[in-house]
Amino acid sequence: ANADRFEELAAEVTQSMLTYDSAWQFPATLLTVALLPAVCEEFAFRGVIQPLVAKWTNNIHAAVWMAAFLFSAIHLQFHGFLPRMVLGAGLGYLVIYSNSLWPAIAAHFFNNAGAIFMAAIYGPEWVAQEMNAAPEWAASDYGIAAVSLFVGIYLVRWVRKTGTWPKHHPVH
């Protein structure tokens, strides 16, 4: 019952953030819903929590999945818990393989920005439908995930091509 109430509140907040009354609200939303969370959450979860757990457990996989679990839990949207946790793990491994937070920040930004653009294109009804469609993924979720995956793969390849991979990494 409490989880459902959190979902309802999250839907209301999300819908209000993604409904625009003036032109300046769209760039403000990109800043507050896409850029700031991407930077702050990646620094917190992949920059602080993940390395701490790796140090405590001496297991990078445990660190990635623990940070991903906490990343998903902190959003308090339980119907989308598993997809968000998998996204968090993907971002965690992106940090490990690139040896940088920036590809994960970029992928996180594009994931969030994709949802903002979809809301701007399809309107508040789309937001309400998407928020109430949980736990199944809608077609747009797959689209956003595919774009995010493409951007993530591109960034990893770019980082690898520029030679910034750590020498001790098993890819070498």
Task: Label the model's feature ranges.
Residues T32-V33, H75-L76, E136, S140-Y142:
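Short alpha-helical transmembrane interface motifs in multi-pass membrane proteins
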Residues F109-H172:
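C-terminal membrane module of polytopic membrane proteins
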Residues C40-M66, Y93-S100:
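Membrane-interface helix/loop boundary segments of multi-pass membrane proteins
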Residues P27-L31, H61-M66, F81-L82, I105-A106, ...:
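Hydrophobic alpha-helical transmembrane segments
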Residues A1-L36, K167-H172:
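Juxtamembrane helix-loop-helix connectors linking adjacent transmembrane helices
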Residues A28-V53, F150-T162:
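Transmembrane alpha-helical segments in integral membrane proteins
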Residues S72-L76, G80-A134:
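Functionally important transmembrane alpha-helices
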Residues V33-V39, F69-Q77:
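Transmembrane alpha-helix interface/packing and boundary motifs in multi-pass membrane proteins
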